[in-house]
Amino acid sequence: ALEATAARASGEQVHKMAGTDSPDGVRRVRDRLVTQGIVLADVHPNATLYLLNRDHVAADANVALARLRAMIIERITAGLSSWSPEPVHASLFGSFARGEATTTSDIDILVVIGPAGAADQDAQAARMDQLSADVLRWTGNRGHILEPTLDVLGAMIAADDPLVASWRADHIHLMGTRLLDLLRSVS
């Protein structure tokens, strides 16, 4: 979180910048980085202010590690953007979207294909296989792609499929029509 600023930040500000619900987890990581000298702590009577020590030999490596999630999202989005025609919608869902993924988790990707994309099923299948292989190569995690057509998506909504509720609850939009707008339009 501190890589985004050149200013000192309080513990609360670091937690907000980290974008996580776990203040204890952020505090433990921050304190470990202070112990290692990667983060500098400036103690004041009312607060301790933290600053990334950009001169530390491990600072760049730590910044790269902190950006892993964003880099994965960027790569998947770039891969999808190269498709012709582009998907109507694409988002990440499941444990990765919730920030709970482990080394054994799949990276779940919802890709909704419009009629033009569904017309050439062989080309579409090849693109899906390539994206799945790319995700595995980039992350070591299997890319699990769910690819409903608009008709199938409408049927899932009509059947009150629990997967739709899961998508509504936690997803990361990648491209195309926003998920909630898409769900409203096909229901």
Region spans (language model):
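Catalytic core of pol beta-like nucleotidyltransferases
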Residues: 1-89, 98-104, 113-187
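Glycine-rich beta-strand-to-loop/alpha-helix junction loops that act as flexible
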Residues: 93-95
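Short, well-ordered beta-strand segments
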Residues: 108-110
